[in-house]
Regions:
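C-terminal hydrophobic structural anchor segments
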Residues: 311-349
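ATP-dependent carboxylate/acyl-activation modules
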Residues: 1-196, 201-315, 349-350, 354-361, ...
Length: 387
């Protein structure tokens, strides 16, 4: 689960991490009042679950409360497009109004789960700010990474090594050591998968502050954190993702044109990989799970077809707990209830596969039945070429 910047900063503040003064506004009039309270120049920041807001025009500086009101009026309600939102963008419904700080230097600090090492990894860099992704790609040596063994936990030497890696003087080094320790505490105690401060800034008066913050939490651990569940913002999710969650379907929208319905996360990822290898482009990740009913399969099918970008559908099922005949029944029932115009490629293997194929064949509907995994991907790739 992702949270907004202002929500992440509230968590940081609760752990003693310094942040700029500021408040959230859902109207331009409220933004003006906040600017009057803060005094001096303020920064108006669009609140959406995506990075790159500054380059997209979602972060502006106002010199007066009246200007803050004017800028907030432009930003609130705008469709903000960044490199992380895709071309469709996200609608801005609120802004964070913060004091403008005199920044001397921008740094980077982040904690993620490194699945290859099966450990949390803390990263710091003297080159923070908007270009950190480019630096990570072109000059990875500028980013210091320290893995933390979960069995021994975060130690003082970890914090000191990372703080020195930021090239800070004595007092700032001490502030950084404390901040890194607190961020790791948040990461562990809140079951986070990402805690990022970018930029971490040094101000003119030698303070270290979190100028921007991003956090993501493990959905499967939210039952332990009722305080975090309250931060959930369904408006930031894709409507189809919200719809899928109602039926306990694991659905993530992507930007391709091949709709995928698969049982099992591993098979779903392998399916997306082979579609790409064959020259196609997956439109989603959709795992119906091992025990899906015919009704769930039907709902999954409807969700796939509701995506206007989808031109071809691939249904790839390996029948184990989820029998092939149950899947076939759900597909046929859904296809009969919607005006089916898209080509459907179906690959079934496993439990009751012959019965499943018979149901598809006798349905009277046109399905492209694949003989194996590769054949399914090739069929899909060839069909997309006509669009």
């Amino acid at each position: 689960m992702k949270v907004h910047e202002f929500q992440a900063k509230k968590i940081l503040k609760g752990y003693g991490v310094p942040i700029p003064r500021g408040e959230v506004a859902k109207t331009a009039a409220k933004a003006k009042k906040i600017a009057e309270k803060l005094g001096g120049k303020v920064v108006i920041k669009a609140q959406i679950h995506a990075g790159g807001r500054g380059k997209g025009g979602g972060v502006k500086v106002a010199s007066t409360p009246d200007e803050a009101q004017q800028l907030a009026k432009k930003i609130i309600g705008m469709n903000l497009v960044t490199h992380q939102t895709g071309p469709e963008g996200k609608k801005v419904k609120q802004v964070l109004v913060e004091e403008e700080l005199e920044v001397v230097k921008e740094l980077y600090l982040g904690i993620v789960v490194d699945r290859a090492q099966a450990q949390p990894v803390i990263m710091v860099s003297e080159a923070g700010g908007m270009e950190i992704e480019e630096i990570a790609a072109k000059s990875p040596e500028k980013i210091l990474k320290v893995a933390v063994d979960p069995t021994t936990g975060f130690m003082g030497f970890h914090a000191r090594k990372l703080a020195f890696g930021l090239g800070l003087e004595k007092e700032l080094n001490k502030q950084a050591t404390t901040m890194i320790s607190q961020l790791y505490k948040i990461f562990v105690e809140k079951d986070a998968t990402l805690v990022e401060v970018n930029p971490l800034v040094i101000t003119k008066d030698d303070r270290l502050l979190a100028l921007d913050a991003k956090m993501t939490f493990d959905d499967d651990a939210l039952y332990r954190h009722p305080d975090l569940k309250e931060l959930y913002d369904p408006d930031e999710l894709e409507p189809l993702e919200v719809e899928a969650s109602k039926y306990k379907l694991n659905y993530i929208k992507l930007d391709g044109n091949v709709g995928c319905m698969v049982n099992g996360a591993g098979l779903a990822m392998a399916t997306m990989d082979i579609i790409k290898l064959a020259g196609g482009n997956p439109a989603n990740f959709l795992d119906v799970g091992g025990g899906a009913s015919a009704e769930q399969v039907e709902n999954a099918f409807r969700i796939l077809l509701a995506d206007k970008n989808v031109k071809v559908v691939l249904i790839n099922i390996f029948g184990g707990i989820l029998r092939c005949d149950r899947v076939a029944t759900g597909i046929v029932e859904a296809a009969k209830k919607v005006e089916l115009k898209l080509p459907i490629v179906v690959r079934l293997e496993g439990t009751n596969v012959e019965e499943g194929r018979r149901i598809l064949k006798e349905s009277g509907l046109k399905f492209e039945v694949a003989v194996d995994f590769r054949d399914a991907a090739d069929k899909v790739a060839n069909l997309t070429k006509s669009f």
